[in-house]
A protein has these predicted regions:
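Switch I (effector-binding) loop of TRAFAC-class P-loop GTPase G-domains
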Residues: 13-18, 40, 119-122, 146-158
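Short catalytic-loop micro-motif centered on adjacent basic/acidic residues
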Residues: 32-35, 87-88, 151-154
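Conserved lysine of the Walker
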Residues: 137
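Conserved short-loop catalytic and cofactor-binding motifs
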Residues: 5, 9, 63, 88
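N-terminal accessory targeting/assembly segments
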Residues: 1-54
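Canonical P-loop GTPase G-domain recognition
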Residues: 58, 64-132, 145, 150
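A secondary-structure boundary/capping signal
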Residues: 35, 44, 62-63, 131
Length: 158
């Protein structure tokens, strides 16, 4: 037992996902971070902020129907104090998603105006949906695709 193997604290799949996010950031206009409204601290990726840098971001507090409404409101206020828009949503029913596009357009209003000045009126907004496993990324994407099935293959879930 003279050989001791070290335990890698940062698994390969996490490093791969980090690289995929970093390389795809230049292709998107905004990052939508999906977190579980019941456990907002533990359902966040602590390195996400350093990965996305200054890219515009919105936080979506999913499963808000199962969370304490008062605590969820406190979290929305917390994010507001940190200059981040947060919306309580429920991907299964669609509750709260009617606020998503108006909020995104507001966050990107200067960028949208710049596109329009360049003649790119109606340019699609490209969004990267990120979050730890089981927060509802696929459910959100499917809901936004009008109930279509985006499938797990379109989502990197690590």
């Amino acid at each position: 037992m003279s050989e001791v193997q070290s335990v890698q604290w940062f698994p390969g799949h996490m490093a791969k996902t980090r690289r995929a996010i970093q390389s795809s950031l230049k292709l998107v206009d905004l990052v939508a971070e999906l977190i579980d409204a019941r456990i907002p601290v533990s359902s966040r990726n602590p390195v996400l902020k350093s990965i996305i840098g200054n890219k515009p971001k919105i936080v979506l507090l999913n499963k808000s129907d199962m969370a304490d409404p008062a605590r969820t409101a406190e979290w929305v206020d917390y994010f507001k104090q940190h200059k981040t828009v947060a919306i309580p949503i429920d991907c299964k029913t669609g509750k709260g998603l009617n606020r998503l596009l108006p909020e995104i357009k507001n966050i990107l209003r200067e960028q949208i105006a710049a596109w329009e000045r360049k003649g790119m009126v109606g340019r699609p907004i490209r969004i990267m949906v990120v979050g730890v496993p089981n927060v509802g990324k696929s459910s959100l994407i499917n809901r936004l695709c009008k109930g279509g099935n985006a499938g797990k293959a379109a989502v990197q879930d690590k």
